[in-house]
Amino acid sequence: MSNPQFRAGFVAIVGRPNVGKSTLTNALIGTKISIVSRKAQTTRHRIHGVLTREHEQFVFVDTPGFQTRHGGAMNRMMNRVVTQALADVDVVVHVVEAGKWSEGDAKLLPLLPKSRRSILVVSKIDALKNRDELFPFVSKLMALHAYDAVVPVSATKGQQLDQLLDEIAAGLPQGDPMFEEDTLTDRPVRFIAAELVREKIFRLVGDELPYGCTVVIEQWEETERGVRIAACVVVERESHRPILLGAGGMHMKRIATEARQDIAKLLDMPVHLEIYIKVRKGWSDREGALRDLGYE
């Protein structure tokens, strides 16, 4: 029987690259479903994370950073993910970094739907050197858009997250839960495993490696001893191969070790992970190649 007091709905978390959207999503859900690195545009897909409380179910849509400077098929695809998410949700959370406002932030404002509850989240408040700067910064942004609420947060320290959830809950429609109570994401574990490998790549060699790098799980075999995984790292140029390998293969060994540890923690079972590299020239600027590699 339906509970007339229960609320459930979709929540888009949007913002320019590197403002902390994925870190916030992971903190709200309480587990890692979106990968994080210093490299902008780490998130490329629309990822649903689910949090269920006593009276609400939040389905968070972690989106790529909205790209305003660079073209190309991948960036067009990521921007489509953002605009589609904004059209399909009940609440919009616009994340901006404390004390920093740029052209990329401003270009998102016209896309925020006026018919949805919109919440301004000022992230990374723990990094502000002078807290007195926060109020004038927020006042400036509130004058630019009619946000329904503003919540300063530190996702890494867990500050103000409960207040943010309460503000989001106020915009969710009444309805039954869409997922089972223990569901954390609608993405399959193979997808999360591939993303964890990509995260380790970006964290270790992201400054040297261009964006033309993705990961595809090509083998997944569960046995009594655990799971055997073969992951293919697809790059665009032969010159990217030595960057990934490192001297004596040390980069790849570290990537594989750290990814294996995270995947084993995710699955709660032993993992044997093999990673190899494949060159596919120009894949990130071809719509067909993007679809072949699992991009929306």
Swiss-Prot record:
Region ranges (G4): 123-126
Membrane topology: Peripheral membrane protein
UniProt keyword rRNA-binding present: yes
PROSITE patterns: G_ERA
Keywords (A to Z) from UniProt: Cell inner membrane, Cell membrane, Cytoplasm, GTP-binding, Membrane, Nucleotide-binding, Ribosome biogenesis, RNA-binding, rRNA-binding
Annotated region (G1), positions in chain: 15-22
CDD domains in UniProt: Era (cd04163), KH-II_Era (cd22534)
GO CC term, one of those recorded: cytosol
GO MF annotations, alphabetized: GTP binding; GTPase activity; ribosomal small subunit binding; small ribosomal subunit rRNA binding
Gene3D superfamilies, per database record: 3.30.300.20, P-loop containing nucleotide triphosphate hydrolases
Keyword Cell membrane in record: yes
Region of interest (G3), residue spans: 62-65
Chief location of this protein within or outside the cell: cytoplasm
KH type-2 domain mapped to chain residues: 205-281
Function comment: An essential GTPase that binds both GDP and GTP, with rapid nucleotide exchange. Plays a role in 16S rRNA processing and 30S ribosomal subunit biogenesis and possibly also in cell cycle regulation and energy metabolism.
PANTHER family in alphabetical order: GTPASE ERA, GTPASE ERA, MITOCHONDRIAL
Family matches, as NCBIfam families: era, PRK00089.1, small_GTP
The protein, known as: GTPase Era
Organism: Bordetella pertussis (strain Tohama I / ATCC BAA-589 / NCTC 13251)
Gene: era
